[in-house]
Amino acid sequence: YKNPLMVTGTQTIKCTTYRAGRQMGKTLTLPLVWNKATAKPVLGNTQAGKILVNGIRGSLRQSDFEWHSWESSDSVAFTIDLQKKESLRSVSVGCITNYGMAAHKPADIEVWVSNDNRDYRKVSGKQFTDGEIFREGTFKEDVVLDLNKEIGRYVRIIAKGAGECPATHVRPGQEARIYFDEVMIE
């Protein structure tokens, strides 16, 4: 390509490298998901927050640079500034479980909404049991929270970690880590 590529909606980009007219390697297929949170500022205690709203979904490896984790998963929070008031139907937060690496979804996740980034109101939440959290395997799932067409500019996600992995876990006593990927707001 010769110019920057401008992406303004959901689409799939395919890239291939050629040398002397011959394809070198595999074609990279990159599905991009566009929603109200895509490319919006992420505020709060997150240094790599941009990957939460970059439109690129993480793989089944939490180390692929598309998953964001925190130093401590006891309680994490971040706020997405939609830059204008919006009608909000739902928030979807991508989570990964990698049992062998103690990567698990949170015990509790809440969504709070504000018009001014000062006064917030809780609009949705979900809690998960240990059986739902500490499932074996490696898989991705989206936690979807209904927002009932709330109006707001700032959307805050607050998650509480599951604590230590249980005695029956492959990593007993180790803190379960939260890994979030794409936050999608409709």
Residue ranges of predicted features:
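Short proline/glycine- and polar residue-rich coil/turn motifs
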Residues: 7, 131-138
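Solvent-exposed serine/threonine-rich low-complexity stretches and specific carbohydrate-binding patches
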Residues: 122-133
